Curated annotation (Swiss-Prot):
Signal peptide: none annotated. Forms oxaloacetate, a four-carbon dicarboxylic acid source for the tricarboxylic acid cycle. Its EC number is 4.1.1.31. Its cofactor is Mg(2+). This is Phosphoenolpyruvate carboxylase. One of its GO terms (biological process) is oxaloacetate metabolic process. It is an enzyme of class 4 (lyase). It comes from the Bacteria. Keywords: Carbon dioxide fixation, Lyase, Magnesium. Residues 14-25, 41-54 have a biased composition (Low complexity). Coiled coil: none annotated. Residues 1-66 are annotated as: Disordered. It catalyses: oxaloacetate + phosphate = phosphoenolpyruvate + hydrogencarbonate.
Amino acid sequence: MKSSGSARATRRNAVSSSSAPAHAEPPARRAAKPARKLDGAAARPLAPTNAASAKPQGRTREDKDRPLFEDIRYLGRLLGDVVREQEGDAVFDVVETIRQTAVKFRREDDKAAAQTLEKMLRKLTPEQTVSVVRAFSYFSHLANIAEDRHHNRRRRIHALAGSAAQAGTVAYALDKLKQAGDASSKTIKQFFEGALIVPVLTAHPTEVQRKSILDAQHDIARLLAERDQPLTARELAHNEALLRARVTTLWQTRMLRDARLTVADEIENALSYYRATFLDELPALYADIEEALAEHGLRARVPAFFQMGSWIGGDRDGNPNVTAATLDEAISRQAAVIFEHYLEQVHKLGAELSVSNLLVGASDALKALAAASPDQSPHRVDEPYRRALIGVYTRLAASARVRLGEGTVPVRSAGRGAAPVRATPYADAEEFAADLRVLTDSLALHHGESLATPRLAPLMRAAEVFGFHLASIDLRQSSDIHEAVVAELLARGGVEADYAALPEADKLRVLLAALADPRPLRSPYLDYSDLAKSELGVLERAHAIRAQFGARAVRNYIISHTETVSDLVEVLLLQKETGLFEGTLGTPHANARNGLMVIPLFETIADLRNASDIMRAFFALPGVGELLAHQGHEQEVMLGYSDSNKDGGFLTSNWELYRAELALVDLFDERGIKLRLFHGRGGTVGRGGGPTYQAILSQPPGTVNGQIRLTEQGEVIASKFANPEIGRRNLETVVAATLEATLAPHSNAPKQLPAFEAAMQTLSDAAMASYRALVYETPGFTDYFFSSTPITEIAELNIGSRPASRKLQDPKNRKIEDLRAIPWGFSWGQCRLLLTGWYGFGSAVAAYLDGAPDAAERGKRVALLKKMNKTWPFFANLLSNMDMVLAKTDLAVASRYAQLVADKKLRKHVFERIVAEWHRTADALAEITGAHARLAANPLLARSIKNRFPYLDPLNHLQVELIKRHRAGDTNARLRRGIHLTINGIAAGLRNTG
């Protein structure tokens, strides 16, 4: 962070020499004409303007990345200026000294630097500490903006140069399939007709950024992008002034909310990404897909196969703050956002479509739509499109009013005529889309197709995708809660006194009898527990929401901790009691159907192993076949990555997920049922995170089949979707990977697959034994974990709407088993060990190779592992993700966290085991891949880490110091705030490691 305010500051680099090549001088960007150079501010042309120079010869990676280094330096200098201006020289100098000392500690594992750093941090006042934390946190955010800008810049340069389509795009997928002979027009058409892709946004306790911060960062990204265009000296100076103002705004804006987060905050946070990205970029993605298809000879309008989902407001698992009221608030706020978008777009269309029937004709349907409009203006008599749009606008406004209440959505004057509230509301979004189609068809018939492209076509696509609900809200609750409510209903109804105590077979007998009986269990004359009333209230509200906003608004019910068939049937019974289940189950001609699909979530290793058996038994129940028929012979199954990882470790979790998927595919194929997998992936590799493209392509053969749902966890939503261009790219990646995985499943089925799978099973068994030996069988490990990570502070600070577990507040009784998977993985990321993404692999490979009877057999086993990496996407993706995690670990920084463990013997024993396993894992990875340097195969990520981590390390050192003070009894509010800031800053710096 270099300030330009003094000679002393000029000698300091905004980015340490570890962060950028020595030749990357502070930017001197060219203006449009050779004017005076501004201090680091001249504009840079985006790309060569002629074809000859569009493909420069001999450019190195450093040449290509020079604009990125310049941007990072430039933003760092602006931030340095602001810190000096706002906080003074003393704070600025402290920030710089801490950075330099931390870099020395990182590079050289310098013990003297560590002692100097510790003394320096100990001397900081609470006020200084917060300022220093904010400085490094904001630099992480600014570096992320620069990286995103560079990704967009490189893609645009590729496009301008006419380069081949890049991996992860639909165009690339189509080219690849065509070359393999898998891309006939009929095949592609069938894929899109049967496809369903749904990213599902979830909340996360540490990554709910304030809208004020997001808005400022969005402006900074936009202004930074402007600097790639030729600018005059005056324009450049104006741009820098605006950038400086927005960085100052960031500095003077609270990073954190004052009050504890509520579900409402989480809802609003998610909605900000719809406004910033999804509302515009998802329709644009559809247009890109259709353009790519047209280039391959398939001119067709694809169905609305890509939709959005959400858990926010509907996920009750472990969060009693999610109720019928929050579900209602979630759908109401979602609907308000989409109605506002529709109304604004229709209003703008009214201004743009000034087409006169004196000059060009219109279809009869369009004329009828115009005639039905309340508009009476004599000035628009010959403008049927405008008149029709006024009618559409008034009906939309009325639709919002009847669903959300008067004044919820801003409504403009629709011109002369009837007030919007008097119009007939649309029955549903399909009716609204049908009116838009009338306009589109009429324009197409009368030489006006180009008029629909800019706004009308995206609006019609939005109506098809978002409906009146914006995103489908999933309901989720734990199976033990369902059992408690069902037991209460059965007991109060005099059916079964102690349902919970029954063996599984008897539970099913009781449940099926209740579902075959048209009479409800619930009585209006009986009182029920608060739990029962709350759970049933959520389902009743879901029933009302479906009637109000359409069946897509709430259509799935996820059952956490599914361990038995009765866990699924209980939710069918709860639907019956709340109007969501029609008919009677298992009786002839009863036309039984459930409104919400019951979706099991298999989470632990044991549950994954039992998944196919549970589903087989469920399908065999009387009447379930009829329910499946009403679902289009489709059934969704959710797989949990987080809990299986906490249970069995990284390698075993991935392997058992793979095996469970294959077993489910075999069962569903046997029964003629279409399987849709819902992947509960987190941000961390330990929670199933990592690059989405490779993750989907590495799925077992036959498991994607055109349909996939996957969670977009709250801790990575900002990095993936805050920038619209990056957001569209991430959305397209999911489509491209699903297309490839569906139509070329053989790419993940190499010839030696049986031998590969046998080796994986051996590795998995050894890895799980190693992992569990550390986590669950090492005496004192629980104390080590709670002392050496910020897990206690995360719990005490009550970050997020989900309350902290009371069990974790009692040191005598807390267990790893009681810890939720998200804070488990998150805490290991904060202390820079990221243990959940690699531990056990080194021991597993060592055991596998050492188990060979002789050197020749050992050589064969090494060769097999190398072949697995080269030809089996599943294994290659697993190693690639592990490589990324190992690159992000820092044993030197982690050793500082280990010092928080008071018991020296325990500290030494556990930390040395972790360090030894890290080296075993790194050695095993090197032997298999042949690469001894981290991320040798991923220079872009290696560069990213190199740029960012010198500014991340100080946040870790500060966090350790603040935790020490906090645990020593310091109750200063600024100290607690500082800890929270470091948590957010480290998460931002690690990006996909939340």
